[in-house]
């Protein structure tokens, strides 16, 4: 069995899909379906069982067994960069991750987990997986950073695989439940389909992010499980492309619309990553050599998926 926490969420459900594509269906999905809309991410997927996150954590802390577990993909977390309840964030993202990590170490179960490019904070260059480059801007980034630091202490002594992925700006299918945290491509598509003008912040041609397609993210996760490499790795494309490029690809697919530029909100000033670009040196050195989709390629594929029933 393979366990996927956050398996009804965005990246988790895409990992479940990638496993299904390889013929793997003996999957336990762990999630919190209080937001009932997330079930749609699993409707077309095949899993063996579902468990609520709280029940799962109780069983993990009690040391209960789940049968022959081949790996745990730990994608479950509070991923809101605008959430400032630090206790909630640390309980959800840090303590929970530590409990799972030790459960896996004791049983030598491969543990693959979601870190984040938010660990780098507001820097504009040298996105390198090393302490001197890390300075998170929000409590979400701090919770991810602190767990990475914890993992670094344990890695040299670990007898089983531990791998963390610093996800950059992930976009693609199965993110509709994320609301304001969904990607720009998702929001632009929704606005166009509602007959509204698609909106970007003023200066969006200057805001550049490393936008990585979720299908590529899932492929990297599965490659690492198959190859047993440990460490903390950036997971982006290695390219910085503008929000304007995302909009251009969206409009090109729809063949209509004109961007409306809106003022940049005061509440985000100083807490907003204006530039991200993954340094893929360590990922490539680990042996992962597949190309990553460009924004034009990924957004076009995503638009086709979003509008498949149109």
Swiss-Prot record:
One of its GO terms (biological process) is lipopolysaccharide core region biosynthetic process. The keyword Acetylation applies. One of its GO terms (molecular function) is ADP-glyceromanno-heptose 6-epimerase activity. It catalyses: ADP-D-glycero-beta-D-manno-heptose = ADP-L-glycero-beta-D-manno-heptose. The keyword Transmembrane helix does not apply. Its EC number is 5.1.3.20. Substrate binds at residues 169, 180, 187, 201-204, 209, 272. Pathway: Nucleotide-sugar biosynthesis; ADP-L-glycero-beta-D-manno-heptose biosynthesis; ADP-L-glycero-beta-D-manno-heptose from D-glycero-beta-D-manno-heptose 7-phosphate: step 4/4; Bacterial outer membrane biogenesis; LPS core biosynthesis. Keywords: Acetylation, Carbohydrate metabolism, Isomerase, NADP. Binds 1 NADP(+) per subunit. It holds the Pfam family Epimerase. NADP(+) binds at residues 10-11, 31-32, 38, 53, 75-79, 92, 144, 170, 178. The active site is at residues 140, 178. Its cofactor is NADP(+). Belongs to the NAD(P)-dependent epimerase/dehydratase family. HldD subfamily. NCBIfam families: heptose_epim, PRK11150.1. Contains a large N-terminal NADP-binding domain, and a smaller C-terminal substrate-binding domain. PANTHER family: ADP-L-GLYCERO-D-MANNO-HEPTOSE-6-EPIMERASE, NUCLEOSIDE-DIPHOSPHATE-SUGAR EPIMERASE. Catalyzes the interconversion between ADP-D-glycero-beta-D-manno-heptose and ADP-L-glycero-beta-D-manno-heptose via an epimerization at carbon 6 of the heptose. Homopentamer. This is ADP-L-glycero-D-manno-heptose-6-epimerase. The gene is hldD.
């Amino acid at each position: 069995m393979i366990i996927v926490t956050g398996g009804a969420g965005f990246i988790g459900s895409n990992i479940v899909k990638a496993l299904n594509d390889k013929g793997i269906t003996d999957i336990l999905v762990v999630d919190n379906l209080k937001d009932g809309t997330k079930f749609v991410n699993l409707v077309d997927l095949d899993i063996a069982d579902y468990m609520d996150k709280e029940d799962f954590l109780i069983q993990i802390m009690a040391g209960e067994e789940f049968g022959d577990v081949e790996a745990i993909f730990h994608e479950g977390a509070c991923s809101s960069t605008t959430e400032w309840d630090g206790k909630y964030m640390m309980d959800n993202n840090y303590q929970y991750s530590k409990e799972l990590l030790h459960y896996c170490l004791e049983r030598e179960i491969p543990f693959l987990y979601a870190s984040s490019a938010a660990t780098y904070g507001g820097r504009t260059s040298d996105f390198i997986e090393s302490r001197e480059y890390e300075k998170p801007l929000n409590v979400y980034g701090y919770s991810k950073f602190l767990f990475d630091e914890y993992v670094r202490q344990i890695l040299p002594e670990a007898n089983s695989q531990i791998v963390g992925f610093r996800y950059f700006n992930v976009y693609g299918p199965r993110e509709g439940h994320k609301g304001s945290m969904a990607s720009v491509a998702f929001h632009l598509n929704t606005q166009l389909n509602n007959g509204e003008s698609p909106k970007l912040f003023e200066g969006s041609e200057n805001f550049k992010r490393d936008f990585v397609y979720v299908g590529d993210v899932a492929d990297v996760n599965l490659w690492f499980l198959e190859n047993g490499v440990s460490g903390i790795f950036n997971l982006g494309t290695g390219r910085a492309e503008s929000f304007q490029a995302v909009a251009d690809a969206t409009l090109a697919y729809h063949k209509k619309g004109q961007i409306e530029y809106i003022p940049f909100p005061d509440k985000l000033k100083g807490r907003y990553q204006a530039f991200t670009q993954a340094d893929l040196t360590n990922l490539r050195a680990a042996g992962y050599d597949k190309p990553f989709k460009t924004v034009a390629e990924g957004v076009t594929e995503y638009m086709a998926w979003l509008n498949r029933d149109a």
